[in-house]
A protein has these predicted regions:
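Charged (Asp/Glu and Lys/Arg) segments that form or flank catalytic channels of large polymer-
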Residues: 2-18, 22-211
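Conserved, non-catalytic sequence blocks in retroelement Pol enzymes and Pol-derived host proteins
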Residues: 9-11, 196-199, 215-219, 241, ...
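Generic structural signal for hydrophobic core residues of well-folded globular domains
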Residues: 25, 212-216, 228, 232-235
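Active-site palm subdomain of RNA-directed nucleic acid polymerases
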Residues: 34, 217-223
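Alpha-helical bundle/repeat cores within regulatory domains of eukaryotic proteins
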Residues: 222-267
Length: 267
């Protein structure tokens, strides 16, 4: 069995299992179900899948997205750093890619795989579990993954850039010299020797990073670090309105304005 066959079978098994699990939801969404409201009145409702919490690999699995690309939009993997918006992925678009690839493949798993991958769609199943769920767009249902996308993703790269610029030993020394503070973890041996870093450790690093680099990086570098940290913290608001979303956009725009600093210094 090839790797492609194995991955396809795993994905197909997952989607077939989810169909069985969500069959009651599918039936209720299509036919409706009577439920008594808080005032004791009977109402017919049509429940649907509106939210799916998963880390990035699981997001790709459930949404039939090619690994390395965005499960929310159609931006190419080599252009994910772009600030320009791409067309959003939708369930209808993904299903059309799968059906078109199936038609062209003529029962060849390899040909089907290649046709889907060319469009940044995963090729494990012909019929995703969400394809017949009423009112559901799986790409909209996916929630942000703060741990893997921000702390274990963006912030991990940010720390690496800072270590590359000022040196691991220098950054460790600055971290060890920080005074005690309420709510701050003290890394008495620095951070470069840490292995299998947890999300909690990343969060504690984020609290102290800016203080450790603000007088050694160039102003553009400090601004870039601050912009990404602002974005990470703003993204964790429990609720958002148009004002707080504008704060997020401002932080992201600021980073894109000064991000070339890291390229210029050879990170």
């Amino acid at each position: 069995m090839t790797d492609v066959d194995l991955r396809s079978r795993v994905q197909r098994l997952f989607h077939e299992s989810m169909k069985i699990i969500l069959k009651p939801l599918k039936d209720a969404g299509q036919n409706g179900v009577k439920i008594r409201n808080s005032e004791g009145e009977m109402r017919q409702i049509h429940p649907f899948l509106c939210c799916y919490v998963a880390d990035y690999p699981e997001q790709c699995l459930i949404s039939c997205t090619k690994s390395g690309t965005c499960p929310k939009c159609r931006q190419k993997a080599n252009n994910l750093q772009s600030i320009l918006q791409e067309s959003p992925r939708t369930s209808q678009w993904t299903k059309s890619i799968i059906l078109d690839a199936k038609e062209k493949a003529s029962d060849s798993i390899t040909a089907f795989h290649c046709a889907c991958q060319d469009q940044d769609v995963a090729s494990g199943t012909y019929d995703p579990f969400w394809s017949n769920l009423s009112y559901t767009d799986i790409h909209k249902a996916i929630t942000p993954d703060i741990l893997h996308q921000l702390y274990q993703g963006i912030f991990k790269h940010l720390v690496g850039w800072c270590q590359s610029i000022i040196g691991e030993k220098e950054l460790d020394q600055r971290i060890r010299c920080l005074p005690y503070g309420r709510g701050l973890r003290r890394f008495k041996n620095g951070i470069s020797a840490l292995s299998q870093i947890s999300g909690s450790e990343r969060k504690n690093m984020a609290k102290i990073l800016l203080a450790c680099i603000q007088d050694v990086l160039a102003p553009r570098g400090v601004q870039a670090v601050k912009a990404l940290l602002d974005f990470i913290y703003l993204a964790q608001y429990s609720t958002h309105d148009m004002v707080t979303l504008s704060y997020l956009e401002d932080a992201l725009k600021k980073f894109h304005q000064v991000k070339k600093y890291f390229i210029d210094v050879g990170c």
